[in-house]
UniProtKB/Swiss-Prot annotation:
Alphabetical list of SMART domains matching this protein: GIYc, HhH1
UniProt entry tagged with the keyword Signal: no
Organism: Rhodopseudomonas palustris (strain BisB18)
GO biological process, one term: SOS response
Bias-annotated ranges (Low complexity): 1-51
HAMAP family per record: UvrC
Residue ranges annotated for the GIY-YIG domain, each copy included: 92-170
Function: The UvrABC repair system catalyzes the recognition and processing of DNA lesions. UvrC both incises the 5' and 3' sides of the lesion. The N-terminal half is responsible for the 3' incision and the C-terminal half is responsible for the 5' incision.
Family stated for the protein in its record: Belongs to the UvrC family.
Subunit relationships: Interacts with UvrB in an incision complex.
Stated name of the protein: UvrABC system protein C
All copies of domain UVR, residue ranges: 280-315
Compartment(s) where it occurs, according to its Swiss-Prot or TrEMBL record: Cytoplasm
Cellular component, GO, one term: excinuclease repair complex
């Protein structure tokens, strides 16, 4: 954290010009994730522990340009007067202050050991950088919250910054909760599952992991190594025969007694030991068992131990760097380039590397890397448990204060270090290399996206470069499970946290009425935008205030007829500022032969290799991918609820034969056409009917 002008009188004049950064670590209770995930293609359909869940791609924030000219004297004088008024009533004790503009929007949240001195530094007529001057000029009032200690002020400050997202603070973005691996403790045969959110369920938690993908890969490998179950308790209790995971050697089958209680408990102990960092001991035990089985000529058993050892080696090879001297630490490295910042975070627990992730905090380019890193750390640990050590690439000010706040929050000692030698220094250097490369890739992608958007402006004769593009599509099978979807793109690429799906509700829509479905989706979307926000929501910050809510360009899948139908909807809603375009597939649905339709214009045909056409295809294909995925989730839900009841020509005897042969509905769904034909009593025609039911081609 930076030294503020009121803290040290000797450097008051110089420090007053320094940008004040917002920091803190808050003790807010972590909330369970509300992410909608599709159950993994596993035997137990309700098991979401290995769900194929997309991690949102982080995007570069929009960095406001620093004004080149001085701020007008009039607004500055008014702002200083408002701050001076607050100084008269401000306490000399620790606290948090909020600067507000004329609309009562919070411009800045800061904390101070002496609030009166800190505010007085803003009331001085000179010595401020342009960014601070602009903030002062916009200020009309100041709110103050007194705290008992400076540490408490630090915690409160970070919490308020995350809640209010003030314009002049450094803001942490893409702050989703991290996934953990949970070995449950409320059943005699524990599960191994993915977990996100509050750690309220009994059991052992291991993490955090940097991404859902790394957790899923690790759990799959752990199942091969330790044969632990991932199914729900309800599925476990309903089994009368082992499921497919037992057959493919990813579960020991405790549900049907294929392994006894002591044997399964030993597997759980081995898995717990491995995740706790005792991997060498576990591998030695497995190697010993393999040699013993081989010596006794039990080659099948020896092969099982060999496969389990290979699975453990696969996990460790995925982890890459596994330090010798660092047991539990988070490593942070920051890099600045082109006016943007990237913070790379590595997680090390029990001496193992559990992944890394890049963040792109929003901060004006006049901030130093030390200021951004300090603000980032405070907000990062606002709702996350800190490890015993935090290793940094750059020394931050008020390091001891942040460490004290994290100690209070976590209940254990927390060290914040900037290592200068040894293995810790190497880990920080590796993280710094990753930060540099991640920011370089992101800047290159953003530059490419900018060129494509400029090409779109030229080709479509748009009035300005679009900041928000919305693409719509719908999917159904003969009108059933109808769903519409909207994807969003902007200067930084796809904005996945803005994607939305719309379950079609209208009863009057006939099967296959694509126009009617699109009408419902667009009416619901734009009526919501046109409606005034509820009073309770009016003053709240948007989830991502850098993404405009109104689109500059709307793209739909279809031809002139679809375009005309959407035009009617827009006219009825009074929309005239949104540009509309329809993309019609070429003959035989060939990519590269699309035709673009826009209101009051002739059809547009682009060359197959035109980068703008490729960009439009990407937008359309992403909408199609998202809507098909949403449709499949709905259909899978219906299939689970209806079972085999809806398949025409499949009576009770054939249903019994199918369930007896495959064991579960999920295995029937996964079966190939040839596998279905092998079931006694199932003809080739019936097998095709069953296969087509589970594998339809959506419209």
């Amino acid at each position: 954290m930076i030294q503020h002008p009121t803290d040290t009188p000797e450097v008051a004049a110089d420090a007053a010009a320094e940008p004040e950064r917002a920091a803190g670590a808050a003790g807010a209770t972590p909330q369970p994730s509300q992410d909608a995930v599709e159950p993994a293609a596993d035997v137990d359909a309700a098991t979401a522990s290995l769900a194929a869940e997309d991690d949102d791609e982080p995007v570069l924030p929009q960095v406001p340009e620093e004004a080149g000219d001085e701020v007008a004297a009039g607004p500055l004088a008014i702002g200083r007067s408002a701050i001076a008024q607050a100084v008269r009533l401000a306490p000399t004790s620790p606290g948090v202050y909020r600067m507000l503009n004329a609309a009562s929007d919070v411009l800045y949240v800061g904390k101070a050991k002496n609030v009166k001195k800190r505010l007085a530094s803003y009331a001085r007529p000179t010595g401020h950088v342009v960014r601070i001057s602009r903030m002062i000029a916009a200020t009309v009032s100041v709110e103050i919250i007194s705290t008992a200690t400076e540490t408490e002020a630090l915690l409160l400050e970070a919490n308020l910054i995350k809640q209010l997202r003030p314009r002049f603070n450094v803001l942490l973005r893409d702050d989703k909760s991290f996934p953990y691996i949970l070995i449950t403790g409320d059943h005699w045969a524990p599960q191994i599952i993915k977990h996100r959110g509050a750690q309220s369920r009994p059991g052992r938690y291991f993490g955090p992991f940097a991404s859902v993908g790394s957790v899923n890969r690790t759990i799959t490998a752990l199942q091969r190594a330790f044969l632990m179950r991932s199914c729900t308790d309800a599925f476990f209790e309903s089994r009368t025969r082992p499921c497919l995971l037992y057959q493919i050697k990813r579960c020991a089958g405790p549900c049907t007694g294929e392994i006894d209680f002591p044997g399964y408990t030993a597997l759980v102990r081995e898995a717990t030991d491995f995740l706790s960092g005792r991997s060498r001991l576990v591998k030695q035990e497995l190697a010993g068992e393999m040699e013993k089985a081989s010596a006794e000529l039990e080659f099948e058993t020896a092969a099982l131990y060999r496969d389990r050892l290979a699975a453990l080696s696969a996990i460790q090879s995925q982890q890459g760097i596994n330090p010798r001297t660092v047991e539990e630490a988070d490593v942070f490295a920051i890099h600045q380039e082109g006016g943007y910042f990237c913070v790379e975070v590595f997680f090390f627990r029990t001496g193992q590397n559990w992944g890394n992730r890049a963040y792109f905090p929003r901060a004006e380019k006049t901030f130093t890397v030390e200021e951004v890193l300090a603000a980032f750390l405070a907000q990062f640990y606002d709702d996350k448990a800190p490890p015993k050590q935090i290793l940094l690439s750059h020394r931050i000010e008020e390091c001891e204060l942040l460490a004290e706040a994290l100690c209070i929050k976590s209940g254990h000692k927390v060290e914040i270090l900037t290592p200068q030698r040894g293995e810790k220094k190497e880990l920080v250097g590796h993280a710094l290399t990753n930060a540099r490369e991640a920011l370089g890739r992101k800047l290159a992608d953003t530059a490419t996206q900018t060129r494509l958007l400029q090409g779109l402006v030229t080709t479509l004769k748009l009035p300005h470069t679009p900041k928000r593009i919305e693409v719509y599509d719908n999917s159904h099978i003969q009108g059933t499970n109808a769903v519409g979807a909207m994807i969003v793109a902007g200067p930084d690429g796809f904005i996945k946290n803005q994607y939305r799906k719309f379950n079609i509700r209208s009863e009057g829509i006939t099967p296959g009425d694509d126009y009617g479905m699109m009408r419902e989706v667009l009416e619901r979307r734009f009526k919501r935008l046109l409606a005034p926000p509820p009073e309770a929501e009016a003053g709240k910050p948007k989830p991502d205030d850098e993404v405009p809510q109104w689109p500059d360009l709307v793209i739909i899948d279809g031809g002139r007829g679809q375009l005309n139908a959407v035009q009617e909807i827009f006219q009825a809603l009074g929309l005239s500022t949104v540009t509309l375009m329809a993309v019609a597939k070429g003959p035989d649905r060939d990519a590269g032969r699309e035709t673009l339709f826009m209101p009051d214009r002739l059809p547009i045909k682009l060359e197959p290799r035109d980068p703008v056409l490729y960009f439009i295809q990407r937008l359309r294909d992403e909408a199609h991918r998202f809507v098909i995925g949403s449709h499949r989730k709905l259909r899978k839900k219906d299939i689970r609820e209806a079972g085999l009841q809806e398949i025409p020509g499949i009576g009770p005897s054939r249903k019994r034969a199918l369930l007896h042969h495959f064991g579960t509905l999920k295995e029937i769904e996964r079966a190939s056409l040839g596998d279905l034909g092998k079931v006694p009593g199932i003809s080739a025609e019936s097998a095709k009917r069953i296969f087509d039911y589970f594998h339809p081609q959506p419209g």
